A protein has these predicted regions:
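Beta-propeller blade termini and top-face loops
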Residues: 1-217
Length: 217
């Protein structure tokens, strides 16, 4: 699991944690610092020993919120989380905000990555290198979540105040329809048998569409 750590303080349980006995005991297998937590961990659907994790350096105080720093990044493990390498080829080297990634179910060699403050990136080789596709990114305090279509390798959904989607691998994004539903979207499910059947989770609850966002209930 990915652990962000305490909201208002440094330290605490931050990093990637692993259990091998159904949750009775946990071992921290990746840790950066007391100021940096982890917000996502993903498994390659073809090999459970291949994992990807995203770190986010942030500070939240009563008087300010700093979303980013040099310790935000993307990591990969080839041995079930025992050892990790940072993926840097094509990733900005300056201060970075929150990361989101999505592995394409159609072709798991393709990894999408959105970096707060930098844009939208794509890898065709399991993270060995990334190319910047566009400047699209969302607010790391609320969103920065991606969901790849199980039907088309070039279709990706980006959660935002108004949910957006791309059909060209992240080069451009357009809004989904929001008529009849609450905005502020955070999670999406795409039916693996029907690309027009979606469920979105937002601040107003769960909404379902059978006509690809033309109508919701």
């Amino acid at each position: 699991v990915a652990a962000y750590g305490p909201l208002w303080n440094s330290g605490g349980e931050r990093g990637i944690y692993k259990t091998t006995n159904g949750g009775k005991n946990w071992k921290r297998v990746l840790h950066i610092s007391d100021h940096t937590g982890f917000n996502e961990v993903h498994l390659d659907p073809r090999n459970p020993d291949i994992l990807y994790a995203t770190s986010h350096q942030r500070q939240r105080k009563v008087w300010t919120y700093v979303s980013g720093g040099p310790e935000s990044g993307l990591y990969k493990s080839l041995d079930g989380g025992e050892n990790w390498i940072q993926l840097k080829n094509g990733i900005p080297g300056s201060d970075k905000g929150r990361f989101a990634i999505a592995i394409s179910p159609v072709n798991p060699d393709v990894i999408y990555c959105m970096i707060e403050g930098h844009g939208f990136y794509k890898s065709l080789n399991r993270g060995a290198s990334f190319n910047r596709e566009s400047g699209h990114s969302t607010s790391g305090n609320y969103y920065v979540e991606l969901f790849a279509s199980p039907h088309d390798v070039n279709t990706i959904y980006s959660m935002d105040t108004y949910a957006q989607w791309s059909t060209d691998g992240g080069k451009s994004f357009k809004r989904l329809g929001e008529k009849g539903k609450h905005v502020d979207n955070h999670v999406a499910w795409i039916d693996p048998e029907n690309p027009d059947h979606l469920i979105l989770g937002c601040d107003g609850g769960l909404y379902e569409t059978w006509d690809h966002a033309s109508s919701w209930h």
